[in-house]
């Protein structure tokens, strides 16, 4: 029986681990990030992958820094035939990558060489792509740069969010891995080198990227809102207060107005001018210190005026 070590951390990784178990591989160990404090009460919380591994009685390693010798030697001591990673969250050292008989392969949520990095799902939507996918490739020390083994495309729908696409890609990754591993073991795959001229990056989202830039086109603002839903959530400011924007709709704007200006107030939301003739009607938001709500609820208690400028005094 093929001995596998799985390395992963978030919810995205769980279906991949589950599929390895269902397919009958001997998952001899799981490597995941350390437990972290979560929420206002800072409750020490295990990763989703750790929770899944413990359900199946699989030993769990939680290195703070996998590149340290005493940490990676614990992985090597398991003597896996194959290592599978999916959103592990740390750079894996060569000592691990070169050890298994069948190598170390990664399940990545983009069609490499596009969108290397830690936030490929967010960027696929923020960039307005109509499709993305899963790549399974050999791991190297350079970020997501290994030779490609298999790929599958996944359509991005018009109203897709990072949350819904995350779920689709997670399942697609598990399914593709299920088909890839037997072919890899049988020596039936021809690795393909990535074209370095086509490389783009999707680095982790920074706080300053979350703010809506109303000078962009309506389509770009709409994609920005979808791409940051349900985390970390796009935001703007209204009357100097931070407001998270959970959802908006593209609408035509007939009269010219400065980008970021409220040009219409309707029952289910208010329309904001952008950098072109497509405005964005905010329909779901979250004022600072309050719960997420529909814009119609918000408008019952707050009455912004037409001409009010959003995005100032952030």
UniProtKB/Swiss-Prot annotation:
Gene Ontology MF terms in the entry: methionyl-tRNA formyltransferase activity
Record-given protein name: Methionyl-tRNA formyltransferase
Its job: Attaches a formyl group to the free amino group of methionyl-tRNA(fMet). The formyl group appears to play a dual role in the initiator identity of N-formylmethionyl-tRNA by promoting its recognition by IF2 and preventing the misappropriation of this tRNA by the elongation apparatus.
InterPro entries for the chain: Fmt, Formyl_trans_C, Formyl_trans_C_sf, Formyl_transf_N, Formyl_transf_N_sf, Formyl_transferase-like_C_sf, GART_AS, Met-tRNA-FMT_C
Family, similarity comment: Belongs to the Fmt family.
Catalyzed chemical reaction(s): L-methionyl-tRNA(fMet) + (6R)-10-formyltetrahydrofolate = N-formyl-L-methionyl-tRNA(fMet) + (6S)-5,6,7,8-tetrahydrofolate + H(+)
Gene3D superfamilies according to UniProt: Formyl transferase, C-terminal domain, Formyl transferase, N-terminal domain
Protein species of origin: Bacillus anthracis
PANTHER family, per database record: METHIONYL-TRNA FORMYLTRANSFERASE (PTHR11138), METHIONYL-TRNA FORMYLTRANSFERASE, MITOCHONDRIAL (PTHR11138:SF5)
Enzyme Commission number(s) of this protein: 2.1.2.9
Annotated Pfam families: Formyl_trans_C, Formyl_trans_N
UniProt keyword list: Protein biosynthesis, Transferase
Xref: PROSITE patterns: GART
GO cellular component: cytosol
Chain positions recorded as (6S)-5,6,7,8-tetrahydrofolate binding sites: 110-113
């Amino acid at each position: 029986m093929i001995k596998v070590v799985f390395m992963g951390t978030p919810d995205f990784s769980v279906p991949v681990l589950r599929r390895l178990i269902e397919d009958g591989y001997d998952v001899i160990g799981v490597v995941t990030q350390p437990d972290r404090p979560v929420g206002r009460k800072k409750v020490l919380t295990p990763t989703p992958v750790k929770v899944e591994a413990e359900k199946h009685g699989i030993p769990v390693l939680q290195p703070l820094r996998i590149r340290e010798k005493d940490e990676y030697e614990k992985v090597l001591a398991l003597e896996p035939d194959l290592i599978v990673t999916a959103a592990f969250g740390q750079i894996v050292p060569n000592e691990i990558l070169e050890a298994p008989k069948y190598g170390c392969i990664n399940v990545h949520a983009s069609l490499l060489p596009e969108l290397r990095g830690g936030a490929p799902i967010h960027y696929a939507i923020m960039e307005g792509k109509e499709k993305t996918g899963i790549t399974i490739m050999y791991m190297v020390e350079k970020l997501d740069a290994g030779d490609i083994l298999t790929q599958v495309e996944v359509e991005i729908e018009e109203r897709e969010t990072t949350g819904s696409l995350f779920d689709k890609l997670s399942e697609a990754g598990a399914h593709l891995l299920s088909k890839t591993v037997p072919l890899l073991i049988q020596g039936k795959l021809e690795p393909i080198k990535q074209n370095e001229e086509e490389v783009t990056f999707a680095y982790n989202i920074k706080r300053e990227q979350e703010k809506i830039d109303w000078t962009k086109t309506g389509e770009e603002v709409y994609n920005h809102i979808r791409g940051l839903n349900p985390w970390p959530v796009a935001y703007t400011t209204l009357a100097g207060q931070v407001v998270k924007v959970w959802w908006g709709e593209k609408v035509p704007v007939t009269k010219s107005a400065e980008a970021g200006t409220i040009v219409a107030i309707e029952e289910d939301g208010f329309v904001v001018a952008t950098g072109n003739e497509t405005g964005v009607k905010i329909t779901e938001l979250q004022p600072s210190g309050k719960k997420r709500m529909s814009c119609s609820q918000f408008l019952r208690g707050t009455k912004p005026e037409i001409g009010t400028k959003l995005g100032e005094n952030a």
